[in-house]
Amino acid sequence: MVSEIKTLVTFFGGTGDLAKRKLYPSVFNLYKKGYLQKHFAIVGTARQALNDDEFKQLVRDSIKDFTDDQAQAEAFIEHFSYRAHDVTDAASYAVLKEAIEEAADKFDIDGNRIFYMSVAPRFFGTIAKYLKSEGLLADTGYNRLMIEKPFGTSYDTAAELQNDLENAFDDNQLFRIDHYLGKEMVQNIAALRFGNPIFDAAWNKDYIKNVQVTLSEVLGVEERAGYYDTAGALLDMIQNHTMQIVGWLAMEKPESFTDKDIRAAKNAAFNALKIYDEAEVNKYFVRAQYGAGDSADFKPYLEELDVPADSKNNTFIAGELQFDLPRWEGVPFYVRSGKRLAAKQTRVDIVFKAGTFNFGSEQEAQEAVLSIIIDPKGAIELKLNAKSVEDAFNTRTIDLGWTVSDEDKKNTPEPYERMIHDTMNGDGSNFADWNGVSIAWKFVDAISAVYTADKAPLETYKSGSMGPEASDKLLAANGDAWVFKG
């Protein structure tokens, strides 16, 4: 039985690309499923001068591919309104406040306000300040703030932003969005581990040799050089998405599956993450930049549009994380992410130690591997040892697997739908809290400092490969190898 959610959501950046492609279709899916019925309202706001009818047409266009029921779509759109608004002008918040109160009265919503900031990060603190000072927060129910990444560009800027936000909101009212945490297969990590004693009992240093997290992209920088050349793979992918996935893998079993206990378990792991000095950065991390490929379409990074000719930016990062925890003593967590690689893939590979039993044959048992493939297909694969078909008692590897069915894909919420729904329910388990964000920044800042000072080699790798040779050597130093070859 679906329970109706009473809420009022204000989308800052309400005419933007993200709102049109992801946010409004996600809210519409919640409406179709019955979570939103009569008592909800959406207020869009941006600098663009639109009236309500023009804004409703924008919403209509954004959801047209998600329904054949025009009457249902029109009933949904009636819950939308719009006000043009300058987020830096305190006086203009009176206009927005009026729109919010009108919508609350019209749809009988008492409190329960969500503010979604799909705007440039430099406006986050300003908006939060004026939401409080100009009286836009509800006196009853809840007030929650959804924040798109990036949350700062360093620990210092993130801490400054956190301080600004906490002048208006408590940390438990802040929902920092990392859409990777909304992906079904990321959430499957916990179910697979804790729901199966066979894995839960072996999720430690006694059985696991190493853990690998890969986020590879086939595209280059495309038209994002202005942003990407200042961020690189380290800030764009490692600091947020990768670290949050690692949190699910490294944490202890939570006391319960509530957001409070899940965050506490993740934080205990993050707090045990070793922060590297300069020598350790060079030992445990590799940075690289893509060069040319076999195709003429594959330009080197330095020849891409708007990329400075002398750029030292990293388009590929590989590294080893270490946790000072009894569970993970001596177990490396390898991470890598890069552009212009051989295949698009987001995956986790858990490599188990090889068996030591002597079968009396020349063939040694291989390392078993549990793989969780997050993108582009959802799948779980298990590589095990079994007897070969030969007469001698030799072993061979066999593959077991499961792939998300088309029916399951159809019924799986998109990440933004899931995260908006979780925020409406006050469930923060799939959002990063300040402790997790701050530790990730401290870890990454130590690496960034070495790279900014140009005190680490900048490798080059061939476009269409899986990265530089140094990435393979990083693992080979421990007797390991990347599971995913591209």
From Swiss-Prot:
Keywords: Carbohydrate metabolism, Glucose metabolism, NAD, NADP, Oxidoreductase
Pathway it works in: Carbohydrate degradation; pentose phosphate pathway; D-ribulose 5-phosphate from D-glucose 6-phosphate (oxidative stage): step 1/3
Effect of mutating residue 416 to F: Decreases catalytic efficiency toward glucose 6-phosphate
PROSITE patterns given in the database record: G6P_DEHYDROGENASE (PS00069)
Active-site residues, record numbering mapped to chain: 241 (proton acceptor)
Binding site for NADP(+): 13-20, 47, 86-87, 149
Summary of the function given for this chain in its UniProt record: Catalyzes the oxidation of glucose 6-phosphate to 6-phosphogluconolactone. Can utilize either NADP(+) or NAD(+).
PANTHER family per record: GLUCOSE-6-PHOSPHATE 1-DEHYDROGENASE (PTHR23429:SF0), GLUCOSE-6-PHOSPHATE 1-DEHYDROGENASE G6PD (PTHR23429)
Protein's name in the database: Glucose-6-phosphate 1-dehydrogenase
Classification of source organism: Bacteria, Bacillati, Bacillota, Bacilli, Lactobacillales
